[in-house]
Amino acid sequence: MNIIEHLTRTVTPILLNNSTDANRSSLLEKLYAILVARFADGHVYNGFASATIADNDTGFFDRLLPDASHRTTLVQELSKHYSVPEQETQSLVSRAAPLVLRELRTLAGNTPVNTFLGSHLSSVASAIPAWAYTFIPASVLGLMNINAAGAAPVVKTTTRTEEHLVATPKEDNGGLM
């Protein structure tokens, strides 16, 4: 089973109100791959395993990816790569996350979602853009045979300042001194 194709058939029409837009559909496919990879990690999924998440819980994405800088980067990258305005991309991402979880729970049935996804990651790996590796737990990257060392490192903001000395000519007052 290709989970990304399934989500594209079931979730995308809801998010796009049954319209067909290649850029938005492609954006959502990449988002689905990233979300599936996050849910495949036991530590990530177990935080939501017994939670009731409403389909319209737009704050769910904030809990799924708690680092605000990661959320911002994810939205900016998707927006840039698929030429969709950032505000609209943010809305699509926030609306998609709970629907994806609901659909994954349905597919998994009585099996824990992360366990179910572990056996379906091969169909997801090729859909994850390299810039998104930083959002995927290293254990999941390993299951997909993606070298975690190749993932973008998480870097805190670094500021570097330098002093530059500039020579200015001295006024000529005449005389020796």
Model-derived features: positions:
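A structural "flexibility-hinge" signal
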Residues: 1-177
